[in-house]
Amino acid sequence: MAQSGSMISGVAGRYARSLFELAQETGAVSVVEGDLVRFEEMLEGSEDLKRLIKSPVFSADEQLKALGAVLDRARISGLVGNFLRLVARNRRLFAVPQMIRAFREIAAEARGETAAEVTSAHALSAEQERELKAALKSVVGKDVTVKVTVDPSLLAGLIVKVGSRQIDTSLKTKLNSLKLALKEVG
């Protein structure tokens, strides 16, 4: 695979690249990406699963056994199941969220797209998401895949991350900036 121009590096980048190359060789990139997205959604929805992958208290065997049960229940097998088990054996589960993000970026780049992570104060409608994709496409010059997460603490607005660039139009950030400006004056 040609070296990508993205900023993906480190442990997560190496694991993600290896998984992508295997998925590409077997023609299963979209299946692998779908399984990774499902696992990511499970992670976001379960504090216990987050604790399992982040806590050094669990031994590799305990993590592997618990992860195996989770993967079996979620019917995640094949490349992604084997990949996550390998990551657990190598004591790298803490980096799985970054690995998933890196895989998505690599897959998007291979499709001629770029990946954007959007954090919004409220859920976006299909129309808003479509308009956001169009606006981002006009800026980056490529089709954009968008992963939207909701964070009510932003109050209003968006935080958009594309590659190493971030645009923060959230009300929370604007209020914090105003607060700092008022402290400097007073």
Swiss-Prot record:
Chief place of localization: membrane
Entries under InterPro entries matching the protein: ATP_synth_OSCP/delta_N_sf, ATPase_OSCP/d_CS, ATPase_OSCP/dsu
Record keywords: ATP synthesis, Cell inner membrane, Cell membrane, CF(1), Hydrogen ion transport, Ion transport, Membrane, Transport
SUPFAM superfamilies, per database record: N-terminal domain of the delta subunit of the F1F0-ATP synthase (SSF47928)
Record's subcellular location: Cell inner membrane
Transmembrane segments: none
Molecular function GO terms recorded: proton-transporting ATP synthase activity, rotational mechanism
Membrane topology: Peripheral membrane protein
Highest taxon listed in the record's lineage: Bacteria
Example of a GO cellular component annotation carried by this entry: proton-transporting ATP synthase complex
Assembly and interaction partners: F-type ATPases have 2 components, F(1) - the catalytic core - and F(0) - the membrane proton channel. F(1) has five subunits: alpha(3), beta(3), gamma(1), delta(1), epsilon(1). F(0) has three main subunits: a(1), b(2) and c(10-14). The alpha and beta chains form an alternating ring which encloses part of the gamma chain. F(1) is attached to F(0) by a central stalk formed by the gamma and epsilon chains, while a peripheral stalk is formed by the delta and b chains.
Biological role: F(1)F(0) ATP synthase produces ATP from ADP in the presence of a proton or sodium gradient. F-type ATPases consist of two structural domains, F(1) containing the extramembraneous catalytic core and F(0) containing the membrane proton channel, linked together by a central stalk and a peripheral stalk. During catalysis, ATP synthesis in the catalytic domain of F(1) is coupled via a rotary mechanism of the central stalk subunits to proton translocation. This protein is part of the stalk that links CF(0) to CF(1). It either transmits conformational changes from CF(0) to CF(1) or is implicated in proton conduction.
Recorded family membership: Belongs to the ATPase delta chain family.
Protein name per its UniProtKB record: ATP synthase subunit delta
Organism of provenance: Chelativorans sp. (strain BNC1)
Organism placement in taxonomy: Bacteria, Pseudomonadati, Pseudomonadota, Alphaproteobacteria, Hyphomicrobiales
Gene: atpH
